[in-house]
Amino acid sequence: MYYVYVLKNKRGNLYIGYSANLKRRILDHRSGKVYTTRRLGKDFELIYYEAYKDIEDAKNREKSFKKSGSVYNGLVKRIKKSIMGA
């Protein structure tokens, strides 16, 4: 399985990525091993993920979140609704 995931830190920064080993990747983020999130701190929490059988599907979904404002905004809205119950 491949996972597209969203992490959030205490300051509210979101990070979107994909991985075949979600648990290990989150630990990498929290330990500062991931260059792209090192400057954002180590206090990341997993707030959302999707699972895919195919790596290309996961890569394409991650790209859609990062490249399309409407897809990203829809994701943020869905996460807020889930967390806040709004």
Predicted feature locations:
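Structure-specific nucleic-acid interaction/processing domains
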Residues: 1-16, 20-86
